[in-house]
Curated annotation (Swiss-Prot):
Domain L,D-TPase catalytic per the UniProt entry, residue ranges: 254-433
Record's protein name: Putative L,D-transpeptidase HI_1667
Biological classification of the source: Bacteria, Pseudomonadati, Pseudomonadota, Gammaproteobacteria, Pasteurellales
UniProt keyword ATP-binding present: no
Family: Belongs to the YkuD family.
């Protein structure tokens, strides 16, 4: 064992030199029992335990060498550009060393486009670190050279991670007080960037990262006109924040778009607006979620299965207070097997705030009205008709339990059922029968429930009430508006 230990130390020293010079990566030894030697070490006389010990020692030494190499690269980069704050210093140190510190940003148009888009993101106030990166770059812009190139690459990596993840992280970054925190982008995204550099396609690559929604583009383009000369920046930052919400929505070309605070549904086909309708959305305590889905089917004469929360909070107190409430509203009480339960058999006094049964309202006279438009949703959200038509005349229509009530549900159903092969006569016949009938959706009909309270359209500001308080929840960073305006123009 003493001989093995000495051999191991000498061999590790030799391996260290070899690894430092070649940058090789070692594979696991214990999985390759047929190996007779490794870098001059005779393995044939070693037990499995000794081989494992050798593997662990080599791995630890490799890790140490990797860390030392990274430290050396970091020091070299600092020597080249000075001690500037970078969000991705280790990655940039490796990248620029591999390129012998050749610049990546020789395309000035691409650099300007990146800074314009990045400044728009910074203006939203969702990231203090991004705001700091922009200010750091501005300090060295006149100096130019490698330091400017590296800082611009640092900004690109930040923006690249943001653009690749903002759609999936919108609820955290754009609708809550959680700050956006940059992470290293995935390697394939980094390689796309570097490939664009090598193929002189950097401007195209930067432009591909921008949002496609035309209201996003109009808002960003017009934003410099609304940047304040005083500290009164509320509307400017509101516009900038909502522009980022717009960037995750595709342009209005195909599908159903419901902007929750506008209480409006718009249905587009091939770029044409074919239906616009007032809607009712969830209350502040039962919010309609920001979500994306696709319509799956239309149900004519749908029954209504009351959500558990609504049963416990709304229906249960009414059913306990009035024995006739259930029959008057055409409700049925069902057990877990779907069997009808006689309300008279229930010991109402023993039930606290959790009703042990399901509640269903029969088709024809249900809270869903004549139509239900289903779509996959983890929150059991869907579009539907309503018998309470007068509610659509209210200015504040945040009145539902989360689902979206559509005023022109009959017109929407006619459009979708026609695509499913139904005639208007068949639709009316099924309606009159009060029989529940479902028709699958044949065409691709995405549904976007989104929340945007301010944007610029044709040069004019549209400013809506923040009905759910999402604008107020954002933990906004301090913005250098003069700097933002400089790069946005």
């Amino acid at each position: 064992m003493v001989v093995f230990k000495s051999t191991l130390k000498l061999s590790l020293f030799a391996l260290s030199l070899s690894m430092m010079m070649s940058g090789c990566v070692l594979v696991g030894l214990s999985k390759n029992d047929q190996s007779k030697s490794l870098y001059g070490i005779n393995l044939s006389h070693l037990s499995l335990a000794e081989r494992k010990e050798l593997e662990e020692a080599i791995y630890a030494d490799q890790q140490r060498l990797t860390e030392e190499k990274q430290t050396l690269l970091n020091m070299t980069l600092t020597h080249e550009i000075g001690d500037h704050k970078l969000q991705f210093k280790p990655l940039l140190a490796r990248l620029y060393a591999s390129r012998k510190y050749a610049p990546l940003w020789t395309d000035n148009a691409a650099a300007r486009q990146l800074l314009r888009d990045y400044a728009a993101m910074v203006a939203s106030g969702i990231s203090k670190s991004s705001a700091t990166s922009l200010e750091t770059l501005a300090l060295v812009e006149q100096q130019g050279g490698l330091v400017y190139d590296v800082l611009l690459s640092d900004i690109l990596l930040d923006y690249l991670y943001y653009t690749q993840n903002v759609r999936s992280q919108a609820s955290n970054w754009l609708y809550s007080s959680a700050q956006y925190q940059a992470q290293q982008p995935e390697n394939d995204h980094i390689q796309r960037w570097l490939s664009a550099v090598e193929n002189n396609q950097l401007l195209d690559f930067i432009q591909s990262l921008a949002g496609e929604n035309h209201l996003y583009r109009q808002t960003i383009q017009s934003l410099p006109m609304f940047i304040p000369t005083s500290k009164e920046s509320n509307i400017t930052q509101k516009l900038a924040m909502n522009a980022q919400r717009l960037r995750v929505i595709p342009d209005f070309h195909n599908g159903i778009f419901v902007n929750i605070p506008s209480y409006k549904l718009q249905y587009y086909r091939d770029g044409d607006l074919i239906l616009e309708s007032r809607v009712i959305v969830g209350t502040n305590s039962r919010r309609t979620p920001v979500m994306y889905s696709k319509l799956s089917n239309v149900v004519v004469n749908p029954p209504w299965n009351a959500p558990i929360r609504l049963i416990n909070e709304d229906l249960l107190p009414k059913m306990k207070a009035d024995p006739n409430y259930i029959t008057e509203h055409n409700y049925s009480i069902l057990d877990n097997q779907g069997n009808v339960v006689d309300p008279a058999s229930i010991d109402w006094e023993s039930i606290d705030n959790k009703f042990p049964y399901r509640v269903r309202q029969a088709a024809g006279d249900s809270a869903l009205g004549n139509y239900k438009f289903n779509m996959p949703s983890s929150d059991a959200i869907y579009l539907h008709d309503t018998p309470n038509r007068g509610l659509f005349n209210r200015k504040n229509r945040a009145l539902s339990s989360g689902c979206v009530r559509v005023e022109k549900s009959d017109q929407l159903a006619s459009i979708l059922l026609k695509e499913a092969g139904w005639t208007e006569t068949r639709k009316n016949t099924v309606l009159a029968s009060k029989k529940t009938t479902s028709a699958p959706i044949r065409s691709d009909n995405p549904v976007f429930l989104y929340y945007v309270t301010a944007w610029i359209e044709n040069g004019n500001i549209v400013n809506l009430p923040d009905i759910y308080g999402y604008d107020r929840q954002i933990n906004l960073a301090e913005i250098n508006w003069d700097l933002v305006k400089k790069y946005l123009q």
